Amino acid sequence: MKAGIHPEYHMIKVVMTDGTEYETRSTWGSEGAVMNLEIDSKSHPAWTGGNQQLMDRGGRVSKFNKRFGGLGL
């Protein structure tokens, strides 16, 4: 790799929606930073089979449903 052009990796803590924590290497944040996930593999319908509702962050889901809810599939 070319020196001086790649971001530095460091250890961060990731906190999943159920409170589970793990450490990983990342270029996000700084050494020891904490990343709190809003949606992860335990809460996203794509991985849970669609049994759970998505949390409506900032009204985006409501706005989508209002606009396209009547289409039906």
From Swiss-Prot:
State the species of origin: Rhizobium johnstonii (strain DSM 114642 / LMG 32736 / 3841) (Rhizobium leguminosarum bv. viciae)
* Matches recorded under PANTHER family: 50S RIBOSOMAL PROTEIN L31, CHLOROPLASTIC, LARGE RIBOSOMAL SUBUNIT PROTEIN BL31A
List GO BP terms, alphabetically: translation
Name-wise, this protein is Large ribosomal subunit protein bL31
Q: Which family does it belong to?
A: Belongs to the bacterial ribosomal protein bL31 family. Type A subfamily.
- The source's domain of life comes to Bacteria
Oligomeric and partner information: Part of the 50S ribosomal subunit.
PROSITE patterns named in the record: RIBOSOMAL_L31 (PS01143)
